[in-house]
Amino acid sequence: MGNRPFGDRLHHEINEDRYAVASTLLLTAPETPLLFMGQEFAASTPFLYFTDHPEELGRLVTQGRREEFSGFRAFHDPSLRETIPDPQAESTFLASKLDLTERALNAGIYELYRELLALRSHDEVFQHNERSHTRATALTAQMIGVHRWWGNEHRLVLANLGPAVSLPVFANPALAAVRARPWHRIFSTAEPRLGGNGRHPEVVGAGPSRVVYVPARTAAIWRIEG
């Protein structure tokens, strides 16, 4: 989310593997993704709320910005709300300026964003945003499956935020529409060029014994033959 009190970003709170998994879900969802500047390369700088209004309007904006957090337990004390950066202060703006050299420093996640955005643009399923052609299911307490389709084309996103999972394909009702078809993996956050460890999800076995294995903190996309 953007505009948190101190501008902290999701990747400031979780490790790189989980951030790659969460980013995969965001960028393959049936909606236009809202990206806050710098999140595509895991910027170290905060995403603060800053403004440049005339003095009186600026004073009201600063006051309103701090008052909007008064309902949060962490900011019940007015003195704590005063620690929220002033949107009108130049220092707030300067703290949010991106360091574009971090694109190279965090090349893996930057390439992941580029690759998934290209997939959204060119893939015949992901380029459509109709939610009626999407089914999302919690497959485990920490793994989500997203089945998207368009015409005879099917895509399956498995996003595992937790420990490694071996999932029986035929025993899972959420996979009924794709379980008997050939699966072809077209994306994996484990890809080394994307900052991954090279341990990719895979489908093993056939028929009722078919199992999909998803390593810890990994996401993958499969093209399912129609």
Where on the chain are the PLM-derived regions?
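Loop/helix patches that line or flank the sugar-binding groove of alpha-linked glycan CAZymes
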Residues: 1-202, 214-215
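C-terminal beta-strand-rich structural cap/linker in extracellular carbohydrate-active enzymes
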Residues: 199-226
